[in-house]
């Protein structure tokens, strides 16, 4: 593929404006995750549009990486399929450029530090902003490195979203909540991504703790497998629910040509549970 092409200014909604809209409607923000390039970027583009049409408020889009330490087997397999189809960060960004004018909800890139540092933090942020990306999630980025990246991202209109785990010490949790932009990402389980039939009850108290620690909305991810967990997250007082492995699994099981349709049907089920 040709080198990255820079388009005109960002036309997507911001993360903050979307949360404000959702909160005004008195419901939970639905934030599906999918892996870019699984099974190919053409299908990814179709799924992104289907998710928006089916009620998604924001979309977390994974950039495939060969050693995804935070991901469970479902998303690892999706990353492997995406890499096998020739997906690269540049191609993912070009796909988003091609969707300009069609996709209006915020897109948040989920990437590991290796692709980010290989491209260079400033260059990566420049290109993400030009592609209309609203934010970044970098799960293996230490807080100290995040404090270097966040100003670079903010200067380009990107929110660097930071993660908090159930095992994060209270003092560090407060620092993360204060430093995160857009929202604070609360990991609901200890371990890697993946569906869980039951989520830890302690997460409910962590939601409230994070809300007291900063002004950001709190979105819960990792382990949300369906509408029941979405309703549970809503009852805890969280502002958003991120659903990844369950959606990726549904897409992988769909018949060729029906992936976007299947993703949209599942998204509608989740949106109904979100309020």
From Swiss-Prot:
Record InterPro entries? Aldolase_TIM, RibuloseP-bd_barrel, Trp_synthase_alpha_AS, Trp_synthase_suA
What stretches pass through the bilayer?
A: none
Q: Matching CDD domains, A to Z?
A: Tryptophan_synthase_alpha
Q: Does the keyword Zinc apply?
A: no
Report a single Gene Ontology molecular function. tryptophan synthase activity
Q: Which Pfam families does the entry link to?
A: Trp_syntA (PF00290)
Instruction: Tell me the Gene3D superfamilies matching this sequence.
Output: Aldolase class I (3.20.20.70)
Task: State whether keyword Manganese applies.
Answer: no
Q: Which GO terms describe its cellular component?
A: cytosol
Name the EC number(s).
4.2.1.20
* Positions of the catalytic residues: 60, 71
Q: Reaction catalysed?
A: (1S,2R)-1-C-(indol-3-yl)glycerol 3-phosphate + L-serine = D-glyceraldehyde 3-phosphate + L-tryptophan + H2O
The task this protein performs is described as: The alpha subunit is responsible for the aldol cleavage of indoleglycerol phosphate to indole and glyceraldehyde 3-phosphate.
Describe the subunit structure: Tetramer of two alpha and two beta chains.
Full protein name:
Tryptophan synthase alpha chain
Which pathway does the protein contribute to?
Answer: Amino-acid biosynthesis; L-tryptophan biosynthesis; L-tryptophan from chorismate: step 5/5
Question: Gene that codes for this?
Answer: trpA
* Record PROSITE patterns: TRP_SYNTHASE_ALPHA
| Family of the protein in this entry | Belongs to the TrpA family.
The UniProt keywords, alphabetically, are:
Amino-acid biosynthesis, Aromatic amino acid biosynthesis, Lyase, Tryptophan biosynthesis
